[in-house]
């Protein structure tokens, strides 16, 4: 499955309990179509103690969400946007904001 966002992209959540939150993509999982976004979809994980190294605790961490629930966030428009792919004169591909023309 192809994902429209990449690692280190700034995205905004468009549906679900975290609707409206923005964050950076920490990791993308193309096989499952999910992304891990910083500060979004926080879950509590019960961590088991290891031999003298780590104490048992309840840790809050990000869980992956479906990539269809996020859109790329354009810093110039200050809005969620769709992207188009454009080939420059030197042959390199860039992603372009459909609203303002800013490159990512």
From Swiss-Prot:
Keywords: Ribonucleoprotein, Ribosomal protein, RNA-binding, rRNA-binding. One of its GO terms (cellular component) is ribonucleoprotein complex. GO terms for molecular function: rRNA binding; structural constituent of ribosome. GO terms for biological process: translation. Pfam families: KOW, ribosomal_L24. It comes from the Bacteria. Gene3D superfamilies: 2.30.30.30. InterPro entries: KOW, Rib_uL2_dom2, Ribosomal_uL24, Ribosomal_uL24_CS, Ribosomal_uL24_KOW, Translation_prot_SH3-like_sf. Disulfide bonds: none annotated. SUPFAM superfamilies: Translation proteins SH3-like domain (SSF50104). Part of the 50S ribosomal subunit. HAMAP family: Ribosomal_uL24_B. One of two assembly initiator proteins, it binds directly to the 5'-end of the 23S rRNA, where it nucleates assembly of the 50S subunit. One of the proteins that surrounds the polypeptide exit tunnel on the outside of the subunit. Belongs to the universal ribosomal protein uL24 family. This is Large ribosomal subunit protein uL24. It comes from Clostridium beijerinckii (strain ATCC 51743 / NCIMB 8052) (Clostridium acetobutylicum).
């Amino acid at each position: 499955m192809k994902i429209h966002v990449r690692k280190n992209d700034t995205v905004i959540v468009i549906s679900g309990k975290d609707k409206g939150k923005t964050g950076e993509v920490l990791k993308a999982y193309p096989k499952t179509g999910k992304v891990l976004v910083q500060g979004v979809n926080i879950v509590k994980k019960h961590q088991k103690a290891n031999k003298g190294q780590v104490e048992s605790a309840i840790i809050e961490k990000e869980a992956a969400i479906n990539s269809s629930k996020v859109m790329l966030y354009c810093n110039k428009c200050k809005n969620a946007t769709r992207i188009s792919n454009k080939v420059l004169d030197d042959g390199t591909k860039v992603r372009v904001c459909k609203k303002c023309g800013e490159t990512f």
